[in-house]
A protein has these predicted regions:
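Short, small/acidic-rich helices and loops at N termini and domain boundaries
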Residues: 1-91, 336, 360-380
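Glycine-biased, small-residue-rich flexible motifs in mid-sequence functional cores and linkers
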Residues: 1-4, 15, 80, 84-380
Length: 380
């Protein structure tokens, strides 16, 4: 049987973990443990497979894989350029090999090599405030300039802002799904997902046709933290799913960072709880870089105390919308709400444009979520 067929069989073995699989193979196979060793499990009685430590669902499937389902899966991966990454492959993310319940197979759309680059997970509330989304975008952009790939879950709010910040800064980003790669969730992020695949990867441990069920998201979260050197929580209520990701990170021996907020905002209580429990309080990207600097790629003229490089462009290169926003901003500190009122632009558009202008060095941010236009640089 060829490698792709065996990989597709693994992908349909519900709940199968790499550790379980390897242990079972070592019990019955004398050949080297690789993807081809999996064939030794096929057709064995379900109770025999369970006695080797595999779960009931995985055992039942391995006893009698459905040929029609596998044929449809093979057609799907070929048509949609889906890559299969089994845990025996040397390209399997090295940090995931240290996660106790790492999946036996990942479905990947995009660049597999992105999964082995240094990553930082950015997570937070789906119903995040505009200021928190701006913060997530800014942190993602600046961390990208330090060589970090930004990993998140494609959800509304902070997840999307983290992906967007990395993309707008020309960086890499990875989205981990709680569904099959054919079921982008939420559906409105279809275009964002395509952009992520072009600048990184979208991955899932779930096979084609898997819908985004509630219990899938903790599984997704443990992959996000498992791929990453650390997890940054930008804004989270006291029962946010982001806290699950943070707990996975702690259990996996990874760093946890949290951005504090107003004591009057219920969406910051989760971050404050993390800080009280030992997470590092973060006020700038420098606070993160100094903790993980030894794991980052070396870059010329960059030290752990340096500020992220900014993309500097002349005002003449800005489009009409950005110029309107700059004119509305002026040189006095101004809130996002005021800019929305002055320009008539949607708040999301203002947020995105402010991020670009800040990366270009034409806008600066101040305390309280206010922005100010910076003097245009002139030669000499």
């Amino acid at each position: 049987m060829d490698a792709v067929s065996l990989q597709l069989i693994l992908g349909r073995a519900s709940g199968l973990r790499y550790g379980q699989l390897r242990s079972a193979l070592e019990s019955i196979s004398s050949r080297p443990i690789d993807i081809f060793a999996v064939e030794a499990l096929l057709g064995k009685r379900s109770d025999t497979l369970q006695s080797l430590g595999l779960g009931p669902a995985a055992s039942a499937w391995l006893q009698a894989p459905d040929a029609a389902t596998l044929a449809a899966d093979r057609y799907w991966i070929a048509r949609n350029r889906i890559q299969l990454l089994d845990a025996f492959d040397p390209r399997y993310p090295p940090l995931l090999t240290h996660v106790r319940d790492a999946p036996a197979l990942l479905y990947v759309r995009g660049d597999i090599e992105s999964l082995s680059l240094p990553q930082l997970a950015i997570v937070g509330s789906r119903a995040a405030t505009l200021q928190a989304r701006l913060t997530a975008m800014q942190f993602a952009a600046e961390l990208s300039h330090h060589g970090l790939t930004i990993t998140s879950g494609l959800a509304l709010g902070i997840d999307a802002a983290g992906h967007e910040g990395a993309l707008r800064a020309g960086g890499r980003t990875v989205a981990v799904l709680g569904s099959g790669l054919d079921r982008i969730y939420p559906a409105q992020h279809g275009l964002l997902a395509a952009r992520i695949a072009a600048r990184g990867a979208i991955i899932s441990e779930f096979p084609r046709g898997t819908v985004p069920l509630r219990n899938h998201f903790p599984q997704r979260n443990r992959l996000m933290s498992g791929l990453s050197l650390g997890t940054l929580v930008v804004e989270a209520a006291d029962k946010s799913g982001s806290l699950i990701t943070a707990q996975f990170a702690l259990d996996q021996g990874r760093e946890v960072f949290a951005i504090p907020g107003s004591i009057h905002n219920p969406l910051t209580r989760g971050c404050h709880a993390l800080i009280r429990s030992g997470a590092k309080l973060v006020e700038s990207t420098r606070d993160i870089i100094e903790e993980i600097a030894n794991s980052l790629p070396k870059q010329d003229d960059m030290s752990r105390n340096s500020s992220p490089k900014r993309v500097t462009r002349r005002l003449a290169t800005l489009d009409k919308g950005h110029k309107i926003l700059l004119d509305a901003l002026g040189f006095d500190p101004t809130s996002v709400d005021a800019l929305v009122e002055r320009t008539g632009f949607p708040s999301e558009s203002v947020a995105s444009m402010l991020l670009i202008l800040e990366l270009q060095g034409t806008v600066g941010s101040e305390a309280g979520g206010r922005y100010v236009r910076l003097p245009d640089e002139r030669p000499g």
